Amino acid sequence: MKLKKKIPLIDQHNKNGFWGGKFGGNFIPETLKKPIEDLTELFEKLRYDKKFLKERDYYFKNYIGTPTSFVKLQNLSDHLSGAQIYAKMVSEANGGAHKIYNATVHCLIAKKAGKKYVVGDTGAGYAGKMLSMAAKKFGLKCKIFMGAKDIKRQKPNVDAMKKNGAEVVPVYSGSQTLVDAVSECMRYWVSNCDNTHMCVGSTVGPNIFVKICGWSTAQISRELKVQIKSEFKKIPKKIKLINCVGGGSSAYGFWSEFIDYDKKQIELIGVEAVSYTHLTLPTTPYV
């Protein structure tokens, strides 16, 4: 994928939602076309609406707790004798993970759309936990679809979702894991889209969900850019930004403000589990 200069990362796709080559798009059944179009139209209005941006920023600061810290790891830097190592402490955010940015924005969108319910899927449970937190904050009823096997593996997060008032729906079809939870969640949304908003927990699925998630987590990158300039008085001549990669939501947010920089100055490095999908291999350097 060749990036276009001066264009935000969430707008790097073509008119059909493709992000270069075979990645992206909107592979959806006909029944989802209208809900997806409506959500796309609403989001494109809200992302430029000054009142909505002010509301988002208010909750990012006073509910999520932004900005999160940018901390030098002095002992590790000394141990390695050379590199100056820093950490962006996104774990300081309310709930302990970056998923809260996306969940909060989705609930704000749901309120603007006049929806009373939010529905989402989860695997490890963090996206579901954050959505249940945000739904409770904004007075929305919440339903989370989760594979039956994942429910057994992730009891603490399941308990947290229930404490926040969410209904956790076990999915027994297929592998009883995330992929099946996503399918069941989509089916439910198709039948209830008149009063229900769907939140996809990462940069996956139809293009609009990738955009909303990336737009939400980009807060991390905006903060980081300011903090780096404050620490070094400018963007250093040589810097490596290392982030974990799973669904892509944190990496998307962590890197989005730095895509216009020359790779010789800022190297973006993703660290992914060994059981990676082969689709990622041509696009991003991994260690």
Segments the model singles out, each with a brief description of its role:
Residues 2-46:
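Long amphipathic alpha-helical segments
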Residues 17-18, 22, 42-109, 113:
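Positively charged, low-complexity intrinsically disordered leader regions
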Residues 94, 102, 110-134, 138-147, ...:
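A short, small-residue-rich loop immediately preceding and capping a beta-strand
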Residues 126-183, 279:
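Active-site-proximal loop->helix
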Residues 175, 203-206, 245-249, 272-276:
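Glycine-rich beta-alpha junction loops
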Residues 189, 193-245:
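Active-site/ligand-binding-proximal alpha/beta "capping" segment
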Residues 277-283:
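Conserved small/polar residues in nucleotide/adenosyl-binding loops
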